[in-house]
């Protein structure tokens, strides 16, 4: 059995189905881009989320959502509508997370425009995971550990021995 991690975008909203044995499965269509030479190619994977796993997350998964999926990999063979044999990559999902590189195009575009308007050089500016501007000169003086561990209280019942 193979296990792998895949990062991509959902090609459709999740579909909920029931198997012939009455088991619930949610199917995600995941598009994973790969580059071969100068050509971009998208590989489509069928991701099966079994039972009630990730039910709280599912309402937030929509077409275009960026996700990171980990799970067991298998290949499924089938006949296409025109009668030719086809195969599909199937992932039985073990974990799924939102990708920090997901498409939030309107927010990303506005942050990029703000960033380019404020500076003429891109050498010292980049965007962080939440889209905040990371200016190397502005954060050089800051103590990165300031406030670390503040506000934590330990109670004797918390200690396991």
From Swiss-Prot:
Organism domain of life: Bacteria
CC terms in the record's Gene Ontology section: nucleoid
Sequence ranges assigned to domain SSB in this UniProt record: 1-100
InterPro entries: NA-bd_OB-fold, Primosome_PriB/ssb, ssDNA-bd
Keyword DNA-binding: yes
GO molecular function, one term: single-stranded DNA binding
Alphabetical UniProt keywords: DNA-binding
DNA-binding recorded as keyword: yes
GO biological process: DNA replication
PANTHER family attached to this UniProt entry: SINGLE-STRANDED DNA-BINDING PROTEIN
HAMAP family: SSB (MF_00984)
Subunit organization: Homotetramer.
Protein name in UniProt: Single-stranded DNA-binding protein
Gene: ssb
